[in-house]
Design a protein with these regions (language model features):
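Intrinsic-disorder/low-complexity detector
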Residues: 1-89
């Protein structure tokens, strides 16, 4: 999160209203707080962040995998952000 010259950048690096950014995080946290949501997030993590590529991986494959990892990491960051938002209320 960054706040420069009254510009609020969300976790994803996009400029938006701070309230809207918090709402996005709260919605994501709510979605993944269910038992099914927790299982889905665990599955996504297992096939992205926890996946190890061998030395023979191509540049294109690696870029594809890193994009997937970024999205799952962003979801997890949004969940942590939502917990901070709730604690600040």
């Amino acid at each position: 999160l960054s706040r420069n010259n009254n510009v609020y950048l969300g976790l994803d690096g996009f400029q938006r209203d701070k309230t809207e950014d918090s709402k996005i995080s709260l919605n994501i946290a709510s979605l993944f707080a269910t038992p099914s949501g927790e299982e889905v997030l665990s599955y996504l993590r297992s096939i992205t962040i926890e996946q190890v590529n061998g030395a023979g991986v191509s540049d294109a494959e690696l870029r594809h995998m890193e994009g997937q990892r970024y999205i799952v990491g962003l979801l997890e960051s949004r969940i942590r952000h939502a917990h901070r938002v709730k604690n600040d209320e």
